[in-house]
Curated annotation (Swiss-Prot):
Gene3D superfamilies linked to this entry: HUPs, Isoleucyl-tRNA Synthetase, Domain 1
Name of the featured protein: Leucine--tRNA ligase
Organism: Picosynechococcus sp. (strain ATCC 27264 / PCC 7002 / PR-6)
Region (Disordered): 586-606
Main location: cytoplasm
One GO biological process term: leucyl-tRNA aminoacylation
Localization in the cell: Cytoplasm
Span of the annotated motif 'KMSKS' region: 614-618
Catalytic activity, EC: 6.1.1.4
Similarity comment text for this entry: Belongs to the class-I aminoacyl-tRNA synthetase family.
Top-rank EC class of the record's enzyme: ligase
Transmembrane segments: none
Length: 852
């Protein structure tokens, strides 16, 4: 055995041996229990970053541990390979998107292999491959056949930089595109949608079945689905047969309606606007069209409106109230209209005051004054007043009575509404999955026949600087015969939102090489659901909600039997690094140009502010994984990533701690090297000495603690701390010829194997084993080894610790008091003194109370 640990010498060797042995191949169906371990697959940017490393190492430890436990494990990897960066690279660098993407995949695949990940590369998928997106298109057609994919003209979120449409979820709280950062505009386009709203209630209710998900993620999805229970009401337009429909959760306040507001985009606006108000209304609509959805609805933004001149009748009171349009009402949400109750809604109250609209109080607190002048909205429940026949009812009773009254009179009904909107999937870009639809002048919209799939992206494409999709300019590619009538027709030129690709990839992994189907029933039902999914919290709504939706739809198409795709979800924290910024200029300064002991701006000499932030190029604080692997090896990088912080917490990069993990692996190496060099013959098993019992107890304590850490919340940091304790316990004993010592050494290496797989296999081999350590079962806990012959008892005098004694385990309370009283430590303080009281805490302490 080499006396010095060299990661460079052993890691490539073992990676090659694992490949030759096929250790990472997914076993076929058997009597063994299955475990599906999955990391969210990456976008192939071409370079691994530390966030990737953390994600994939966490999943790999789980996969390796489960294999050692006797599970057959599916641990695949692939590439979320469609998307704008490849298209922008074609524009900026003149490289075709496919070439750029596949080059990046090749680079990142090798980087991942260097980490020693136990991935079954035979199941690798790339969403940009026609072999994959053929089935993405096929699944889209399943949605279409089920009535879940449809077209409509809609005011959509338009990214003016990337020249494409965004889903609501892809616009941040400031109204900016999630990718380009541009202020999003509204634009009317005919688009494809998926009817996720058909599954809103099931998506909401099934969150209750996801016991293995973080509560935070479930709450985010619950809020996004946004279920509201209320009523649908119709206000007749004066002088017209039209009605303004509204949804309200405060039916008890309907007698306080003093105006109705339409969204500027509402189709009734043109009909209800009077000639006198047309100019003002048109100007207001033009002004609002320049505002983002977020600006229009944010609490801290002004709520602006203008009167249309039209009126509606409150069906409960017969009173006519004005119709206004306002920026804070969105046509895409609810009915696109709201009733204004300024006495009992803070936003309505502010809007009414600014527009000189009346305020009518109809709810008062119990014991309140119905004639009092309101200075601000009363928004709580209470007693109904000024509400005709419903006066005196409490809000809850009033809601029910009014709902019944409205239903009986034909102008309202109880209703459930969701904040969730249908999923807009059309994108005006090239590098995405083509939507498999055809437009025929005679037959209308026609699906591409299954036999003609995939609709393949053309390769001879010219790109202009972010000027929309080149597919729309390619007449030859668009030209196609109609599958129904055979006449000349044209292809759809939009491609799908890339979140479609990632909404089913976990299903494809179960049968990745099937050329006849996206996946067959036997393998998909064998492996699904994913037992452990690992990825970032940033995907809580988008990817995770869409994946749940897709799974439910394919279940209803009898393609899979599970209701939910992911049993357990671990959302790992970010990897942060020390970041420097000049507080005067607000500019980031590269960390490698700063002395951490005296941080100064290298250009100006000004003092810098140092703090931890997520690693990123723009902050000049990234750490290249390749440099860490070159210097220390993959095992050290893995150990640091796992030890530095619990997986769900943010991790702060620290070079000194990386060095610390390298030293720890060296200590284990030296321990095994010393044992091997001693060439000690192991003596026969006999009665164990105290030292042997103590060592065996340390071994099985480590097994117990590490197993609990890997079964529960994946506290890898405390598991590695147990490895350190065990290493120290072995180092401190001298019985190297004992079978217990050999058991301890081998157990230490077995426990290390999921965390640092290369060094573990090397040390296992050096101990004379011919098989890979990754084929050996996880150590079995022997509960009897945890029992102790003696325990330590603290002796206290007047509550102050004076020393400890050893007593037999299981000693009675009375015998413990006698033994403690007779001990030299106690006698030193109590001899010849009155003992007022003796407090005995079994297995812990004895406290003597004597006169001061």
């Amino acid at each position: 055995m080499e006396t010095r640990y060299s990661a460079a010498d052993i890691e490539a060797k073992w990676q090659q041996q694992w490949l030759e042995l096929g250790l990472d191949k997914t076993p076929s169906q058997s009597d063994k229990p299955k475990f599906y371990a999955l990391s969210m697959f990456p976008y192939p940017s071409g370079k691994l970053h530390m966030g990737h490393v953390r994600n994939y190492v966490i999943t790999d430890v789980i996969a390796r541990y489960k294999r050692m436990q006797g599970y057959r494990v599916l641990h695949p990897m692939g590439w979320d390979a469609f998307g704008l960066p490849a298209e922008n690279a074609a524009i900026d660098r003149g490289i075709p998107p496919a070439k750029w993407t596949y080059q990046n995949i090749a680079q990142m695949r090798e980087q991942l292999k260097q980490l020693g990940l136990s991935i079954d590369w035979d199941r690798e998928v790339a969403t940009c491959s026609p072999d994959y997106y053929k089935w993405t298109q096929w699944l889209f057609l399943q949605f279409y056949k089920a009535g879940l994919a449809y077209q409509k003209e809609a005011a959509v979120n338009w990214d003016p930089i990337d020249q494409t449409v965004l889903a609501n979820e892809q616009v941040d709280a400031e109204g900016r595109s999630w990718r380009s950062g541009a202020i999003v505009e509204k634009k009317l386009l005919r688009q494809w949608f998926l009817k996720i709203t058909d599954y809103a209630e099931e998506l909401l209710q099934d969150l209750n079945t996801l016991d293995g998900w973080p509560e935070r993620v479930k709450l985010m999805q619950e809020n996004w689905i946004g279920k509201s229970t209320g009523a649908h009401l119709e206000f007749p337009v004066v002088g017209s047969d039209e009605k303004v429909a509204v949804f309200t959760t405060r039916l008890d306040t309907v007698f306080g309606v003093t105006y109705v507001v339409l969204a500027p985009e509402h189709p009734l606006v043109a009909q209800v606007t009077t000639p006198a108000q047309k100019a003002a209304v048109d100007a207001f609509i033009a002004e609002v069209s320049q505002e983002s959805e977020q600006d229009r609805t944010a609490d801290d933004k002004p709520k602006k409106g203008v009167a249309t001149g039209g009126m509606v009748t409150n069906p409960f009171t017969g009173e006519e109230v004005p119709i206004l349009i306002a920026n804070y009402v969105l046509y895409e949400y609810g009915t696109g209209a709201v009733m204004g109750v300024p006495a009992h809604d803070s936003r309505d109250c502010k809007f009414a005051k600014e527009n000189n609209l009346p305020i009518k109080m109809v709810i008062i607190p119990e014991g309140g004054d119905a004639t009092a002048v309101l200075t601000e909205a009363y928004t709580e429940a209470g007693i109904m007043v000024n509400s005709g026949q419903f006066d005196g009812l409490v809000s809850t009773e009033g809601k029910k009575a009014i709902a019944k009254f409205a239903a009986e009179n034909g102008f309202g009904r109880e209703q459930i509404q969701y904040r969730l909107r249908d999923w807009l999937i059309s994108r005006q870009r090239y590098w995405g999955c083509p939507i498999p639809m055809i437009y025929c002048d005679d037959c209308g919209v026609v699906p591409v026949p299954d036999s003609d799939l995939p609709v393949v992206l053309p390769e001879d494409v010219e790109f202009s600087a972010r000027g929309g999709s080149p597919l729309a300019q390619m007449a030859d590619w668009q030209a196609v015969d109609c599958p129904c009538c055979g006449k000349a027709a044209r292809r759809e030129t939009d491609t799908m939102d890339t979140f479609i690709d990632s909404s089913w990839y976990f299903l494809r992994y179960t049968d990745a090489n099937n050329t006849e189907k996206p996946f067959a029933l036997d393998p998909v039902n064998d492996w699904m659901a994913v037992d452990q999914y690992v990825g970032g919290i940033e995907h809580a709504i988008l990817h995770l909600l869409y994946s749940r939706f897709f799974t439910k739809v394919v279940r209803d198409r009898q393609l899979v039997s599970v209701d939910e795709p992911f049993k357990r979800l671990l959302t790992q924290g970010m990897v942060q690094a020390l970041t420097y910024k000049n507080p005067r200029t607000n500019k980031y300064v590269p960390a490698d140009q700063v002395d951490p002991n005296d941080p100064k701006d290298p250009e100006t000499g000004e003092p810098l502010t140092g703090f931890y932030e997520k690693m990123s190029k723009s902050k000049y604080n990234g750490v290249d994984p390749a440099l860490v692997l070159d210097k220390y090896g993959a095992d050290t990088a893995r150990m640091f990533i796992l030890f530095k912080a619990p997986p769900e917490k943010d991790l702060e990069w620290d070079d000194a701690d990386v060095e610390g993990q390298f030293r720890f692996l060296n200590r284990i190496w030296n321990l095994v090297a010393g044992y091997e060099a001693a060439e000690t013959s192991v003596k026969a098993t006999g009665e164990l000495s105290k030292a042997e019992k103590d060592l065996r107890r340390a071994v099985h304590t480590a097994i117990k603690e590490i197993q609990e850490d890997l079964e529960g919340d994946y506290q890898f940091n405390t598991a590695i701390a147990e490895l350190m304790k065990l290493n120290n316990a072995i180092k401190d004993v001298k019985c190297v010829d004992s079978p217990v010592y050999k058991e301890a050494i081998e157990t230490l290496i077995l426990l290390l194997a999921p965390f640092a797989p290369h060094i573990a296999d090397e040390l296992w081999s050096n101990l004379g084993h011919s098989e890979s350590i990754h084929t050996v079962p996880f150590p079995q806990l022997d509960e009897t080894a945890l029992t102790v012959d003696e325990i330590t008892i603290v002796i206290q005098i007047l509550g102050k610790t004076r020393g400890t004694i050893q007593v037999p385990a299981g000693i009675s309370k009375a015998d413990l008091e006698k033994t403690a009283t007779a001990s030299d430590i106690a006698q030193r303080y109590i001899a010849g003194k009155e003992i007022k009281k003796v407090i005995v805490v079994p297995n812990k302490l004895v406290n003597f109370v004597i006169p001061k």
